[in-house]
Amino acid sequence: MKMVFCDIDGTLYRDNKQISPLNKEALMRFRDAGGKVVYCTGRHILEMGMILEKDGYPFDYLVLNNGGAILDGNKDTLYEKHIEASVGLDILQWGVDANMFVHMCDGKKSYGCFNHQSFAHSDQGDIPIPDDYMTLMKKSPSFQIISLNQENRQTDQIDMIKKRIEEKYGSYVECHPNLHFLDVVPNNCSKGTGVNYLKENTNATTYTIGDSWNDLSMIEAGDHGCTFDYAHDAIQKKADHVYSYVYEMIDDILGGKI
């Protein structure tokens, strides 16, 4: 059995718009030929509605939260880890104090905050709400993922808060930086651990493709690790194959070239 692990942002979508409709068509052809499709992403489940329901991308598994949660084709949970409430609250407070855009998901709800304005968060956008953010956060028993965004698109604050998190909570969480974003997930979670989990439980031949730094563990874990010609040179050097679009990789798989 062959299994494709595909990143979302920068791979299938850019600014929440499909990069090419041919990618979806190719994934459907791959699935029709008996392959399994997995989306391997830093997104949480509440951010996947547009892709799965509205745009109708086919899937058999979901690796979410940079490996923190793995779901089957019915969206039933196969694997899940959480960040302890006390740890998550500290990290969120640091982000709020630094006036970064912060957001979290506890598996059922997702909220963000910037400039002391709270938002209900989804893949359809951010809806302002009147609640005090940290008071709202204390109602969550734990967190699946916490994300921090430096709004000026620089990385100095991201670098500092990453260091602070790792110094105090390095045995509890992992940090996955991606440009001016930082995803914080439970320890021993990455896209690569998601690939390995499904590989061990299905004995599939794995093909992985992504474009950014948080995709490296996935690219390296796959039997055939792939990236794009627009990815950083250091990422391209780690990959077995380099493409312009996902559908090119699918064509090579179905054509027996890889």
What positions do the PLM features span?
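Mg2+-dependent phosphoryl-transfer enzymes with acidic/Ser/Thr/Gly-rich catalytic loops
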Residues: 1-2, 20, 181-258
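Structural recognition of alpha->loop->beta junctions
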Residues: 54-69, 74, 125, 130, ...
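Short hydrophobic/aromatic-enriched beta-strand-loop microsegments
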Residues: 59-65, 80-81, 123, 225-229, ...
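Active-site phosphate-binding/coordination module
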Residues: 18-118
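Asp-based phosphoryl-transfer active-site loop
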Residues: 2-17, 219
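Conserved acidic, metal-coordinating active-site core of Asp-based
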Residues: 98-101, 105-218
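Non-catalytic pre-domain segments flanking phosphatase-related domains
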Residues: 1-6, 25, 29
